[in-house]
UniProtKB/Swiss-Prot annotation:
GO molecular function: sequence-specific DNA binding
Known role: Required for spatial organization of the terminus region of the chromosome (Ter macrodomain) during the cell cycle. Prevents early segregation of duplicated Ter macrodomains during cell division. Binds specifically to matS, which is a 13 bp signature motif repeated within the Ter macrodomain.
Subunit structure, interactors included: Homodimer.
Name of the protein: Macrodomain Ter protein
Lineage of source species: Bacteria, Pseudomonadati, Pseudomonadota, Gammaproteobacteria, Vibrionales
Compartments reported by the entry: Cytoplasm
InterPro entries referenced in this protein's UniProt entry, alphabetically: Arc_rbn_hlx_hlx (IPR013321), MatP (IPR009390), MatP_C (IPR035375), MatP_N (IPR035087), MatP_N_sf (IPR038339)
Length: 149
């Protein structure tokens, strides 16, 4: 699915991505010399409020190894951004204990589906089981009443 590209917004995301990588200690420039690296990072930090300048900084200074990773990160961010606009595509996150995640993951693999689909399947199965149990109990009560008469 294609999503609209918004230059200003995406340039801000690119700037944030590069700054985060730099803060994590990963090389964001193509340079080896420390002074060149520092100068390039200073330029990057200086253009925080001028997002469109990030594109020229990327062309001029960014490490080629980071190119694909940056594109993938921005593509994922764009997808999440546009999916968050509609309630049916908005994602929610939950915390699971490791053992619960492991069981859910095994069930999802067994069913050949995603974790979300597995949860939905298990809930619908539990609901059907509950309805069947109520029906059986109701039949037992009716039968007991008939036999008592």
């Amino acid at each position: 699915m294609k999503y609209q590209q918004l230059e200003n917004l995406e340039c801000g995301w690119k700037w944030q991505y590069l700054i985060n990588k730099w803060k994590d200690g990963e090389p964001v420039t193509r340079y080896i010399d420390k002074s060149e690296i520092e100068a390039a990072v200073q330029k990057l930090r200086a253009i925080e409020h001028e997002p469109t300048h990030v594109l020229s900084w990327i062309e001029e200074h960014m490490s080629s190894e980071l190119d694909n990773k940056l594109k993938q990160a921005i593509r994922a961010k764009r997808k999440r951004h546009f999916n968050a606009e509609q309630i049916h595509t908005r994602k929610k996150s939950i915390d699971l204990d490791y053992r619960v995640w492991e069981k859910l993951s095994l069930k999802a693999n067994e069913l050949g589906c995603t974790l979300s689909d597995a949860i939905e399947y298990l809930l619908s199965e539990a609901s059907r089981s509950e309805k069947a149990s109520k029906t059986v109990n109701s039949l037992k009560e009716d039968l007991s009443r008939l036999l008592a008469e």
